[in-house]
């Protein structure tokens, strides 16, 4: 399938998998955010934004086990420390402030339907991104993509194993 022209690659994305708050005297004020960095590198000093709150901060430290680094590369499992104590929880996304994603409530996407019950407009489903889950409504089914790549055909629903373009409202 041809990737959508709004598909983003090469931008730093850090989904927070856990918040690290050691309960020891030595690290009584430590607050770190652990996860796996994707898309691009992140450096100490980078301005970052936490989604969905849009809270801003600066990366002060990057940890990997007991080592500190000035920069982390995409694919690295790391812990980030931020300049100020802000509310960051599991499932939040930390991104470079200069690389904010486009935030939408109305999404056009391609899906492969895997349920024996047909997907129809008006139906409600949960959509999950990382660990965050929201209720979404199928606004419309635009078409079915032929599996032999011969084209598309208009459709108003998707049956099991059909690939189609749909509009989803979050």
Segments and roles (model prediction):
Residues 22-170:
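C-terminal effector/interaction modules appended to NTPase cores
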Residues 1-27:
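P-loop NTPase catalytic nucleotide-binding module
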């Amino acid at each position: 399938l041809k990737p959508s022209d709004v598909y983003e690659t090469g931008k730093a994305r850090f989904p927070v998998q856990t918040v690290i708050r050691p309960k020891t005297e030595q690290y009584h004020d430590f607050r770190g955010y652990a996860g796996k960095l994707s898309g691009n590198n992140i450096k100490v000093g980078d301005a970052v934004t936490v989604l969905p709150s849009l809270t801003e901060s600066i990366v002060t430290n990057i940890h990997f086990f007991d080592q500190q680094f000035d920069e982390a590369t995409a694919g690295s499992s790391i812990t980030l420390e931020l300049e100020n104590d802000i509310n960051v929880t599991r499932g939040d996304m930390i991104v470079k402030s200069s690389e904010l994603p486009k935030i939408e409530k109305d999404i056009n996407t391609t899906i492969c339907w895997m349920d024996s019950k047909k997907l129809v407009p008006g139906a409600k489903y949960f959509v999950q991104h990382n660990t965050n889950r929201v209720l979404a409504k199928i606004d419309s089914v635009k078409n079915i993509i032929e599996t032999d790549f011969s084209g598309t055909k208009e459709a108003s629903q998707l049956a099991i194993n059909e690939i189609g373009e749909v509009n989803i409202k979050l």
